[in-house]
A protein has these predicted regions:
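Glycine-rich phosphate-binding loop and adjacent beta-alpha segment
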Residues: 230-298, 330-336
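A short acidic, Gly/Pro-enriched loop at the edge of an enzyme's catalytic core
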Residues: 219-226
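Glycine-rich beta-strand-centered segment in the early N-terminal region that forms part
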Residues: 23-38, 50-109
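C-terminal capping/lid region of NAD(P)-dependent oxidoreductase domains
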Residues: 297-301, 315-336
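A structural motif shared across PLP-dependent enzymes of the aminotransferase-like
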Residues: 111-124
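Short glycine-centered segments of the SAM/dcSAM-binding site in methyltransferase folds
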Residues: 104, 164, 247-248
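Short, well-ordered loop/turn sites that connect or cap secondary structure elements
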Residues: 99-100, 159, 243
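Mid-domain Rossmann-like dinucleotide-binding core that forms the NAD(H)/NADP(H) cofactor-binding site
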Residues: 140-211
Length: 336
């Protein structure tokens, strides 16, 4: 089968189209013909991990070295990128009961990766579900990562109708899904993003948008019941005045300082709280997003598609920083 392979860390130039063996499903696995996979932050990080410093790593510093060892210190252990996808089940293992050949699915495979290829094997107990029937493969492929992360993290800070929420980093995979989920829950949503993506965030349903290149949301006098910081670039001290007395600062990416702030607010039992958490990968979140997408309450807006052989160009396009919505690699005509 065809796949995009990288055997060394570096720029998009390390990505090469190659012929590799087609996988065969184990008794508890499904073989999926991949039609589409988006280029996300995890792909860019994994491709260039050797050149990433601990300060650039969007998690606490003690996790940097274990992560580097897991990915491969000098060269990548996983040589095919792609952690989310949409495609069609081609074959199933003898013990599989959830799926059958012909099923159209979407999935998140996490650090295992492997979606930049024509085929991938996924455990039938994994984070995989039937895709929304009203979405194309390319559209459906953009949903799993954001759906799982945003759904899981928002459960840490349950929203009530009418509450005010600010999403910092509203145009990325997690942020764009968080905007839509918060709106679905009845919140008043403000999205923070850069100039090129203001229209995109508005199209997701945000009530207000803030261009961070023109305005500092911590200085505009507004207060929020929840600030969901996807990027983890702000400090609690700087934005606590933008929280209501019982407001929550929820982080998807964070450093040790934020963890200490979380412990401090928990110990002092002050009204305001800092929450740092890892997302749980639950297939039910995919099912829930599928139903919302079928009902037209979740949108999948694509910036641009690239064919598999242009994966390197897709990475360059994403790294240039001008994208408005997900960028998708299509691996067969039906996935476009």
């Amino acid at each position: 089968m065809k796949a995009i392979v990288f055997t060394e860390y570096g720029s998009p130039d390390v990505l090469h189209l190659k012929d590799v063996p087609k996988p065969f499903p184990k008794e508890n696995e499904i073989l999926v013909r991949v039609y589409a996979t988006p280029v996300n932050y995890g792909d860019l990080t994994a491709r260039n991990f050797a050149n990433l410093t601990s300060s650039e790593f969007n998690m606490p510093a003690p996790l940097f070295f274990p992560a580097r060892l897991s990915f491969g210190w000098n060269k990548p252990k996983t040589t095919i990128l792609g952690s989310e996808l949409a495609g069609q089940v081609e074959a199933v293992g003898a013990a599989v009961t959830r799926f059958r050949p012909g099923d159209q699915v979407f999935a998140y495979v996490g650090a295992k990766m492997g979606a930049y290829a024509e085929y991938i094997c996924i455990p039938d107990t994994g984070t995989v579900a039937l895709k929304p029937a009203n979405l194309t493969y390319a559209e459906a492929a953009t949903l799993p990562y954001g759906a799982i992360m945003a759904s899981s993290l928002l459960r840490k800070a349950p929203l009530q109708p009418g509450q005010k929420v600010l999403i910092n980093g509203a145009s990325g995979g997690i942020g764009s899904m968080a905007v839509q989920l918060a709106k679905h829950l009845g919140a008043e949503v403000t999205g923070v993003c850069g100039t090129p993506r203001l229209a995109f965030v508005r199209s997701l349903g945000a009530d207000k948008v803030v261009d961070y290149t023109q305005e500092d949301f911590t200085q505009n006098g507004e207060t929020y019941d929840l600030i969901f910081d996807i990027l983890g670039k702000r400090s609690f001290a700087r934005l606590r005045h933008s929280l209501t007395p019982n407001g929550i600062y929820l982080l998807a990416s964070y450093k040790m300082k934020a963890v200490l702030q979380m412990l401090w607010t928990a110990v002092t039992r002050s009204g305001q709280k800092v929450i740092c958490a890892f997302a749980e990968e639950k297939v039910q979140d995919l099912v829930s997003i599928r139903e919302l997408a079928k009902a037209g309450q979740i949108k999948a807006i694509i910036d641009r598609c690239f064919p598999l052989e242009q994966a390197a160009e897709a990475h360059r396009y994403v790294e240039a920083g001008g994208k408005q919505g997900p960028v998708v690699i299509t691996i067969a005509g039906e996935g476009e």
